[in-house]
Amino acid sequence: MAKSKGARIIVTLECTECRTNPDKRSPGVSRYTSTKNRRNTTNRLELKKFCTHCNKHTVHKEIK
């Protein structure tokens, strides 16, 4: 029998304000990678992280 990979997966978090705000410090979209446990956190991850393009702390949401 093959061993299962487990419930922990790598997800990408993207800044929500970079997509909508045209007057930001530099062009581009801030992205972070993180891990989450699929069994404990079934819904999409949402964390407050520092965005280097907006130059402030913003909400970063999980993308596919």
Curated annotation (Swiss-Prot):
InterPro entries per UniProt: Ribosomal_bL33 (IPR001705), Ribosomal_bL33_CS (IPR018264), Ribosomal_bL33_sf (IPR038584), Ribosomal_zn-bd (IPR011332)
Designated name of the protein: Large ribosomal subunit protein bL33
One Pfam family from the record: Ribosomal_L33
GO terms for MF: structural constituent of ribosome
PANTHER family, per the entry: 50S RIBOSOMAL PROTEIN L33, CHLOROPLASTIC, LARGE RIBOSOMAL SUBUNIT PROTEIN BL33C
Keywords: Ribonucleoprotein, Ribosomal protein
KW Cell membrane (keyword) present: no
Stretch forming the signal peptide: none
Highest rank taxon of the organism: Bacteria
GO biological process: translation
Source organism of this protein record: Nostoc sp. (strain PCC 7120 / SAG 25.82 / UTEX 2576)
Recorded GO CC terms: cytoplasm; ribonucleoprotein complex; ribosome
